[in-house]
UniProtKB/Swiss-Prot annotation:
Keywords: 4Fe-4S, Cytoplasm, Iron, Iron-sulfur, Metal-binding, S-adenosyl-L-methionine, Transferase, tRNA processing
Binding site for [4Fe-4S] cluster 2: 179, 183, 186
Residues in TRAM domain copies: 398-468
Protein name (Swiss-Prot/TrEMBL): tRNA-2-methylthio-N(6)-dimethylallyladenosine synthase
Family named by the database record: Belongs to the methylthiotransferase family. MiaB subfamily.
EC number in record: 2.8.4.3
Gene source species: Kocuria rhizophila (strain ATCC 9341 / DSM 348 / NBRC 103217 / DC2201)
GO cellular component: cytosol
Gene: miaB
Cell compartment(s), UniProt: Cytoplasm
Top-level class of the enzyme under EC nomenclature: transferase
Cofactor note: Binds 2 [4Fe-4S] clusters. One cluster is coordinated with 3 cysteines and an exchangeable S-adenosyl-L-methionine.
């Protein structure tokens, strides 16, 4: 297919690759994120790189570039990627300007296999060389040949790359990349490498910069945040980091994800309890309640230790909402093992749980285990577990009816229901709250904070419908100011149902009456 030869030195003033225009204006991009918060934050960096190179978001037009940022944790992530790539094949045939790039953990794992399965893909890049994407795209365009570049170690710490934050009022900050654990079900350490920690000063500088730009909430990210500091010889570094973040003026909400039960220490619990802007919420992955299965998983803790952590957290932070991850059907799991998990879930009283059916991941020790659990058994156990957790979540949420929730309003509330006109946001303990603005009251902007009465509850959300304006309080925040300024800068109308939402902050858009 014909291409205009690129400028032999396609660099902008900052040294970044710029894309040739080919007489049709700036090329448009779309980033599709498949995976966890790490991937979503990486997608913000991909977006920043692309816009720095001259691309613009594909709003109301067909993209010239589609970038997939992939996950390799579960089999359905593979299926989702190749399904979407298949849908793009005919689009590529009729649009010779379209480029397709695949990055992230699945790209790091599958490498050239992606191009073999989907030869219409132009670029495959890994978790360690996100910054190379603009160069690889230009090389693929110039050479008219797919470019596959996977590095075995980190090229540049990702936070050094340009970043376009999806929301002005909230953001992620990476404190480390990679993982030193050896869980038998997980392929992430192979794909993201050994843990590398940023220095506290760099992290705090990024947090301050976010707050200065209007952010009121920051989430600290790492594969195992409470092992932060081991690389530079300070095992208490994470607790110190939480306290230091707590001293940053204007930062209203601090969250972090994810810790590991084996390394979760009381100094972190104390820092959470004693730092007012660290939110009363904790995500603590259980994975299994069976000590036998935990040993096979190489999780380095047992159920008694796990429950002890929850007890200590609730002793210091009585209103803490605790969430978890659970795998059902790990190889060798017996009915008794599963019953042990149900018992721990019942005792833990999680506010919610991310439950997963185990899927074989090639390259992991668990994938080689002979005693795989039949799919029908896994499905039946999964349904029993989710029924138990749904009941616990609903009961805990119903106990909040009659209390008030302080809600940070989300920009991603989804389509307004004609019958309820509800907006959405997150409470201090990270519960999803759908609320109405009473007649005569001022509507909030995304990033503002409202105080509303909880009037209803379901398993995974709260409802807040103030009877009148006297039950509703709005606090216009710096976050709302930042959101409004960003809208004006982009000459965009406030978010609507048709707006692209490539990266979000974990705010579901589903609303039920």
């Amino acid at each position: 297919m014909p291409h205009t030869a690129p400028d032999p030195s396609p660099l902008n003033a900052t040294g970044a690759v710029t894309v040739p225009r080919e007489g049709q204006g700036a090329p448009a991009y779309e980033v599709r994120t498949l995976g966890c918060q790490m991937n979503a934050h990486d997608s913000e960096r991909i977006t920043g790189l692309l816009e720095n190179a001259g691309y613009v978001p594909a709003v109301g037009r067909e993209p010239d570039l589609v970038v997939f940022n992939t996950c390799a944790v579960r089999e359905n992530a593979d299926n989702k990627l190749y399904g979407q790539l298949g849908q793009l094949a005919p689009v590529k045939r009729r649009n010779d300007r379209l480029q397709i790039a695949v990055g992230g953990c699945l790209a790091q794992k599958d490498r050239s296999t992606i191009v073999e399965k989907a030869p219409w893909v132009d670029v495959v890049f890994g978790t360690h060389n996100i910054g190379s994407l603009p160069v690889l795209l230009e090389r693929a365009r110039h050479n008219q040949q797919a470019q596959v570049e996977i590095l075995e170690s980190l090229e540049t710490f990702p936070s050094a790359l340009p970043t376009k934050r999806e929301q002005a009022y909230a953001g992620w900050v990476s404190i480390s990349v990679g993982c030193n654990n050896t869980c038998t079900f997980c392929i992430v350490p192979q794909l993201r490498g050994k843990e590398k920690d940023r220095r506290p000063g760099d992290i705090l500088a990024e947090v301050r910069a976010l707050v200065d730009s209007g952010a009121v909430e920051v989430t600290l990210l790492g594969q195992n945040v409470n092992s932060y500091g081991v690389e530079f010889g300070d095992r208490g570094a994470f607790a110190k980091l939480l306290r230091a973040c707590g001293e940053i003026e204007g930062l209203e909400r601090i969250r972090f994800t994810s810790p590991h039960p084996a390394a979760f220490t009381d100094d972190v619990i104390d820092a959470m309890a004693e730092t007012p802007n660290v939110m009363p919420q904790l995500h603590m992955p259980l994975q299994s309640g069976s000590d036998r299965i935990l040993k096979r998983m190489r999780r380095s803790y047992r159920s008694t230790r796990f429950l002890g952590i929850l007890d200590r957290v609730r002793d210091r932070i009585p209103d803490a909402a605790i969430t978890t991850d659970i795998i059902v059907g790990f190889p060798g799991e017996t009915e008794q093992d599963f019953q042990d998990t149900l018992d721990v879930v019942a005792a833990s009283e999680f506010s919610s749980a991310f439950t997963f059916q185990y899927s074989i991941r090639p390259g992991t020790p668990a994938g080689e285990m002979a005693d795989q659990v039949p799919a029908a058994v896994v499905q039946e156990r999964f349904e029993r577990l989710t029924a138990l957790q749904d009941g616990i979540s609903a009961r805990l949420n119903r106990q909040l009816v009659g209390t008030r929730a302080e809600v940070l309003v989300s920009a991603q509330s989804g389509r307004k229901s004609e019958s309820t006109h509800r907006l959405s946001g997150r409470s201090r303990d990270q519960r999803l709250v759908h609320f109405t603005v009473p007649d005569g009251a001022v509507a909030p902007r995304p990033g503002d904070v409202v105080s509303v009465p909880v009037t209803g509850a379901a398993s995974y959300h709260l409802l807040a419908d103030p009877a009148d304006a006297s039950q509703y309080a709005l606090r216009r925040s710096r976050g709302g100011d930042a959101w409004e300024a960003a809208q004006a800068e982009s000459c965009a109308a406030p978010s609507s149902a048709g707006s692209p939402q490539a990266v979000g902050l974990g705010m579901p858009t589903l609303r039920k009456s």
